[in-house]
């Protein structure tokens, strides 16, 4: 049961909220979501499995709901609350708006912090080494001789660090730090960690101390996945001590799959292995040769197996088997016998080399800690060995996945070879799981103190089934499911118009039909957004309509012609000055674009956003479903299109008093068997269907 003190704290928050915000009106759906989150975390639905999956439509106020339902419970039970998001925009909203507001209304003290990965911080010792007056020392840390402007920038950064005016966070430096500069000073787990006394004052170590003390932590999905891939509790708090709120949860499956994937070049890897071959003697000397000799021998032996093998694999690749995109995918993830054999050898050799280099790295670290070697030499050696450790870790992951035997149950791995665009004659080996749900369940859901997954779009075709399968949540395992409709009056404030068209989007002449049809639905409109399925089609239509736009004094703004920020600013300025403004955009404009009020009155969607399985992972997934007797179009394409279409129409109504219309120029929503399910999953617009 939910403790009376937690109930009291939540009630007090609501009372204080009324005092803090003018015209605050409690929303029934938000109140219900708060109560369900609190009851789920308290174990009222299941004592051990404390999970809620909630789709909360636009306007409900889900972020305030999970703060109200989650923070009082977490603090009362001495747990951390970790909020994971997919976008920087939501992180900024939470840090700069929602959490400061909650801090004012919550009757008790609590602290919150934005967590970032180690690579967002500089290492003080690397920064000092780069600024050293010894030119030889400077240059050895750079792949190319540094520019004077780069060294001047580094010296300013060092001074700001020493003066306490910069915390070492890349994002907080007032100007953009060039990508050629940042890797020289970036913290890494091998050479910059709190185990070395001289690094305990480095920016990441300090940030980690603050994170350990914080009650509420904001992170992104990538950092969350990085932590659980390491076993949990390494970068972020232990899962058993953490209540997770996964906002924008519909992005989690892709992020999780990307983190479980791996890629490595063949000849490129052989090249850096040769460099390791040349430098390992120097590292072994610093590690104390007597102790390091056997590890050095093991590294040399395994490198000398890897280098010719990787080159031989590259030479054995048949260039005639690649698609026009430079990709060859192994059907059903099955490798030819010769490559399967080489994969096993590469897996074993890279694993042994990694273990042995790790031992040498640890020996150098110990000697540095005991002041047995010069700090400058030790730091430089750790940085160098750290780079090779990271490369070997990746190499071992790639070949371990390539060598993994076929499972009796479940989806196979997607495996493919890609031409290296940066190095002619070289190839990149790539491996990715098709399904990551089991891994998420094993590493996160089964260990978490509680988990709340929310988004405005989680269901496909009005069901949670597709999302649950993606993230490893089983609908019969006592998880609490909620689908809360938006409070907006769609029926009276918005129309969904489906014009009678003669062609479907896949027809050859459909682009010509768009050019002919669009002006009818742009005429007389002040603020329009037209969403296309491809850049090619968008640009073709834009080019054909420019003369008409000029004649009618429409301002036509096309995605990609200028930065997103400038394009949207021009659109907003046009709307404010009363000039008809038309935005042309592709898929990225269908999510996360906020154009409330007079900034959008007319949304035109040129086609149902079906994705064609073109990537190796998508092709492999479709192939697997077919092999199981399923239908990839109905099991993947239609659910994905449903989610994307909901996101697209969601651009129109952003606030309670917004009004406008959606025009869908795709007749398939009327005349195909899946059309009704897609249509019924949309918000309850007033429908104007021009088909008899």
Swiss-Prot record:
Gene3D superfamilies in alphabetical order: P-loop containing nucleotide triphosphate hydrolases
Reaction equations catalysed: Couples ATP hydrolysis with the unwinding of duplex DNA at the replication fork by translocating in the 5'-3' direction. This creates two antiparallel DNA single strands (ssDNA). The leading ssDNA polymer is the template for DNA polymerase III holoenzyme which synthesizes a continuous strand; ATP + H2O = ADP + phosphate + H(+)
Cofactor(s) essential for the protein: [4Fe-4S] cluster
The keyword Coiled coil is annotated on this UniProt entry: no
Domain Helicase C-terminal: 514-692
Domain Helicase ATP-binding: 16-293
Tree of life domain: Bacteria
Entry-linked PROSITE patterns: HELICASE_ATP_BIND_2 (PS51193), HELICASE_CTER (PS51194)
Cited function: DNA-dependent ATPase and 5'-3' DNA helicase. Unwinds D-loops, R-loops, forked DNA and G-quadruplex DNA.
Name the UniProt record assigns to this protein: ATP-dependent DNA helicase DinG
């Amino acid at each position: 049961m939910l403790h009376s003190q937690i109930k009291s704290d939540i009630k007090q928050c609501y009372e204080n909220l009324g005092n803090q915000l003018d015209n605050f009106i409690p929303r029934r759906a938000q109140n219900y979501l708060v109560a369900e989150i609190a009851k789920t975390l308290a174990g009222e639905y299941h004592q051990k499995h404390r999970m809620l999956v909630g789709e909360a439509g636009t306007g409900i106020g889900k972020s305030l709901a999970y703060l109200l339902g989650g923070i009082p419970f977490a603090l009362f039970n001495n747990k951390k609350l970790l909020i994971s998001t997919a976008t920087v925009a939501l992180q900024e909203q939470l840090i700069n708006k929602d959490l400061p507001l909650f801090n004012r209304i919550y009757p008790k003290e609590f602290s919150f912090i934005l967590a970032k990965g180690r690579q967002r911080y500089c290492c003080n010792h690397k920064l000092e080494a780069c600024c050293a007056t010894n030119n030889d020392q400077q240059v050895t840390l750079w792949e190319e001789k540094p520019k004077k402007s780069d060294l001047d920038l580094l010296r300013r950064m060092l001074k700001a660090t020493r003066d306490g005016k910069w915390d070492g966070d890349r994002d907080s430096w007032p100007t953009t730090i060039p990508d050629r500069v940042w890797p020289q000073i970036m913290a890494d787990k091998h050479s910059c960690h709190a185990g070395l006394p001289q690094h305990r004052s480095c920016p990441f170590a300090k940030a980690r101390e603050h994170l350990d003390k914080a009650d509420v932590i904001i992170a992104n999905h990538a950092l969350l996945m990085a932590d659980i891939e390491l076993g949990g509790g390494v970068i972020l708090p232990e899962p058993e001590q953490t209540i997770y709120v996964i906002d924008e949860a519909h992005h989690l499956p892709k992020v999780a799959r990307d983190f479980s994937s791996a890629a490595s070049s063949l000849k490129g890897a052989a090249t850096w292995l040769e460099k390791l071959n040349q430098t390992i003697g120097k590292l072994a000397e610093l590690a104390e040769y007597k102790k390091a000799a056997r590890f050095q021998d093991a590294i040399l032996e395994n490198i000398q197996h890897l280098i010719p093998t990787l080159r031989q694999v590259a030479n054995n690749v048949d260039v005639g088997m690649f698609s026009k995109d430079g990709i060859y995918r192994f059907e059903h993830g099955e490798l030819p016998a010769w490559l399967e054999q080489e994969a096993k050898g590469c897996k074993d050799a890279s694993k042994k080399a990694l273990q042995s280099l790790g031992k040498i790295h640890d020996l150098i670290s110990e000697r540095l800690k005991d002041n047995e070697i010069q700090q400058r030499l030790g730091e430089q050696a750790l940085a160098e060995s750290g780079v090779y450790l990271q490369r070997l870790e990746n190499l071992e992951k790639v070949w371990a996945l390539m060598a993994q035997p076929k499972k009796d149950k479940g989806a196979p791995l997607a495996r493919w070879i890609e031409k290296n665009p940066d190095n002619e004659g070289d190839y990149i080996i790539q491996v990715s799981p098709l399904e990551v749900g089991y891994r998420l369940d094993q590493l996160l859901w089964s260990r978490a103190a509680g988990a709340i997954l929310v988004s405005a779009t989680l269901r496909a075709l009005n069901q949670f089934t597709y999302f649950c399968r993606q993230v490893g949540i089983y609908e019969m395992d006592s998880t609490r499911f909620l689908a809360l409709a938006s409070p907006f009056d769609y029926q009276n404030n918005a129309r969904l118009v489906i014009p009678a068209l003669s062609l479907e989007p896949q027809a050859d002449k459909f682009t010509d039909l768009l050019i002919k049809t669009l002006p009818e639905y742009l005429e007389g409109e002040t603020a329009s957004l037209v969403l296309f399925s491809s850049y090619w089609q968008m640009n073709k239509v834009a080019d054909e309509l420019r003369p008409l736009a000029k004649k009618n004094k429409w301002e036509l703004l096309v995605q990609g012609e200028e930065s997103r920020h400038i394009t949207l600013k021009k659109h907003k300025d046009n709307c404010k000055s009363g000039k008809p403004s038309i935005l042309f955009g592709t898929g990225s404009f269908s999510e996360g674009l906020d154009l409330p009020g007079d900034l959008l009155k007319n949304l035109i969607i040129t086609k149902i956003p079906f994705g064609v399985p073109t990537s190796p992972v998508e092709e492999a997934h479709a192939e697997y479903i077919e092999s199981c007797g399923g239908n990839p179009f109905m099991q993947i394409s239609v659910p994905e299109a449903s989610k994307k279409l909901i996101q697209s129409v969601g651009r129109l109504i952003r606030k309670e008093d917004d009004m406008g219309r959606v025009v869908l120029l795709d007749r398939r929503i009327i005349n195909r068997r899946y059309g009704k399910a897609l249509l019924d999953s949309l918000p309850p617009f007033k429908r104007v269907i021009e088909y008899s």
